[in-house]
Amino acid sequence: RAVSFTGGTATGRNIMKNAGLKKYSMELGGKSPVLIFEDADIERALDAALFTIFSINGERCTAGSRIFIQQSIYPEFVKRFAERANRLRVGDPTDPNTQVGALISKQHWEKVSGYIRLGIEEGATLLAGGADKPADLPAHLRNGNFLRPTVLADVDNRMRVAQEEIFGPVLAVTTFKTMEEALEIANDTQYGLGAGVWSRNGNLAYKMGRGIQAG
């Protein structure tokens, strides 16, 4: 028999400390990086990056909540990403046309909304979404816990929005120049649940896979 726990990092550490010799399995959240190199298939990378953060309203431990884009393609990629994020349909999750539904509770909505405000205060640039409910929600949904898909660009990896799990539709975007820099910032986190690499260069992708501390 073993102890299995999915939840907060602090609680998981306390369980591990008291588990003694018992086997345990811990899934304690994530801040998964997605690294997009200049030779990537941009259309496929855009599709994947949108899905990894905004599917299931961003309430997924493996959400790609940090995206690192190589400097040479950064302006165009982040512009197109923000445009597509702004077009995602927020609304009733029972409607097949809806792409982003409501967060799990009012308390969690306030937490995620607070992180968006914090990111802006820390110096990030808001390119899509925001901390308020969508203005175009129909009357019967206005009391729901809805947030627009949010893109925070120009994020420094020391910011809290880059280091702490938000667990919502909020993306932190950073740029990098070299593979070495990408590895350094991707690994500069307490989490290591998942990661993604987009490149047509198999050797580069292999090296990144070996170097990223995740999985």
Predicted feature locations:
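ALDH superfamily catalytic-core signature
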Residues: 2, 8-156, 185-186, 212-213
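Conserved phosphate-binding and hydrolysis motifs of nucleotide-dependent enzymes
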Residues: 7-8, 168
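Conserved C-terminal structural/oligomerization subdomain of aldehyde/semialdehyde dehydrogenase
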Residues: 35, 89, 139-215
